[in-house]
Amino acid sequence: MTEVYANPAAGVYGRERSTSLAMRRGLMGCCPNCGEGRLFRAYLKVVDNCSVCGEELKHQRADDAPAYITILIVGHFVIAGVLAEDELYPTLNMALVGIVWSLAAVAASLALLPRIKGALIGFQWAARMHGFGGPEKEFV
């Protein structure tokens, strides 16, 4: 294998990593390197190493970004839904509407949060951020 610069500015050697593939794998909750191993050991707890390829995943620093992105996405749908419902059915009880849309927002947030965190971890891995620039594995 010939060495190429994956990131000339950072002086990182290795193969190019596909950002879209890594983000898709993370979105599905799989290792961004091999796509086989699990990314999470619990709801939002990331495994230290992939059980299949051994890629170290403890370097991830998703922090609060997945929550902000989730709020951005869910908020747009909930606000649009509330406004559309108010336009179409103006006589509905607003307390009931508030309860229903609040529950929908919580459910959508809980469903999206680990997927968005996985996609963000995949992006960090592909961009070799936060210590993900180590030696290449045989996968990918």
Name every feature range the model reports, one short phrase each:
Residues 2-16:
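Short, Lys/Arg-rich, polar N-terminal cytosolic tail immediately upstream
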Residues 2-6, 92-140:
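Cytosol/matrix-facing juxtamembrane amphipathic
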Residues 18-28, 39-45:
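Short, flexible, mixed-charge glycine/proline-rich loop motifs
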